[in-house]
Amino acid sequence: MEMNKVLHQDLVQATRRILKLGPSELRVTDAGLICKNPNYSVCDAMLKTDTVYCVEYLLSYWESRTDHVPCFIFKNTGCAVSLCCFVRAPVKLVSPARHVGEFNVLKVNESLIVTLKDIEEIKPSAYGVLTKCVVRKSNSASVFNIELIAFGPENEGEYENLLRELYAKKAASTSLAVRNHVTVSSHSGSGPSLWRARMSAALTRTAGKRSPRTASPPPPPPRHPSCSPTMVAAGGAAAGPRPPPPPMAAGSWRLCRCEACMGRCGCASEGDADEEEEELLALAGEGKAAAAAAGQDIGGSARRPLEEHVSRRRGVSTHHRHPPSPPCTPSLERTGYRWAPSSWWRARSGPSRPQSGPWLPARFATLGPLVLALLLVLALLWRGHGQSSSPTRSAHRD
């Protein structure tokens, strides 16, 4: 791989990060010069004494990025040790007679070239070992010691035992983490059992709600205890309890016509009330026909309960439909056997009187006795006047 500015900048940043160097501890060569001559050092780092530096890791990183065999050169400048980093090792500095050990002594102006091959040779084990370097001050003046310390197992057997221990610890930590996660989930409410319980509760609530199309109509209100209307015959006696109304259709409400509940229990419908009135009027007509055949007239006492019952029935139904306005003139409605005033007029004019004729309205029945009395008085007056005038006529004749 050819050297470019991007690769140069990446190598410099990686060196500063791995060796943990400050801004003043690393001197960087210009990228243009490195691109023209890769044999120059990319950067020079000033190392501190008694500080551990990851040399092997940095060499591996440079090798993977440049596809070359990099080399680091430790050089004693008299007052400190500098580390020169090369992408390619200079030919004049690389000698076959050099030797790199775990403990190296550097005098003034002496150098130590270190590559990955040298570090692998001093490793006690080929696997699981990371080599680091430490610069120490020697007892002699201007002399430094470079120590390459291998951190890891001492041999291959120890490395294998170390791997077994590491794998066992990892498996134990994994199982413990899974157990703790399950315990925390069960306590916090995110476990599968609690989720299943919540889902079942939600389904139960959803099943309890029915759509408006499939929901059955609400039950009708209870029947009033005193709501048992009876049928009144022509003679004024009760003919027995009224037969029960037909069953209501689903979703429908009927209006009660009985006197006790005042339309609150829904025990009868409008059609049932009309049928009952027709039956009562038919019974009254039959009673009148029987009395006429026997040569008797139906009195007010025998006909009054029937008319009062019919008027009350009609008044209740009219009240529950809509409150009517008082009419200007009393309207007549056709009954089963004669013309009679409306229920509203009968309710305000009191109980009906015996009718004087087959087609005479009921409101004129009360005027009959008065008219007859007036006629009788006039007849008596006329007769008295006639008797008083008869002696005068006889005197004139004489």
UniProtKB/Swiss-Prot annotation:
Residues 311-323 have a biased composition (Basic residues). GO terms for cellular component: host cell nuclear inner membrane; membrane; viral tegument. It is found in: Host nucleus inner membrane. GO terms for biological process: viral budding from nuclear membrane. Keywords: Host membrane, Host nucleus, Late protein, Membrane, Phosphoprotein, Transmembrane, Transmembrane helix. Residues 1-359 are perinuclear space. Residues 225-240 have a biased composition (Low complexity). Residues 202-246, 306-334 are annotated as: Disordered. Residues 215-224 have a biased composition (Pro residues). Residues 383-398 are nuclear. It is a single-pass membrane protein. The chain crosses the membrane at residues 360-382. It comes from the Viruses. The modification Phosphoserine is found at S216. Phosphorylated. Phosphorylation by viral kinase UL97 at Ser-216 plays an important role for correct viral nuclear egress complex (NEC) localization. Plays an essential role in virion nuclear egress, the first step of virion release from infected cell. Within the host nucleus, NEC1 interacts with the newly formed capsid through the vertexes and directs it to the inner nuclear membrane by associating with NEC2. Induces the budding of the capsid at the inner nuclear membrane as well as its envelopment into the perinuclear space. Forms a heterohexameric complex with NEC1. Interacts with host UBA7 and RNF170; this interaction promotes UBA7 proteasomal degradation. Belongs to the herpesviridae NEC2 protein family. This is Nuclear egress protein 2. It comes from Human cytomegalovirus (strain Merlin). The lineage of its organism: Viruses, Duplodnaviria, Heunggongvirae, Peploviricota, Herviviricetes. The gene is NEC2.
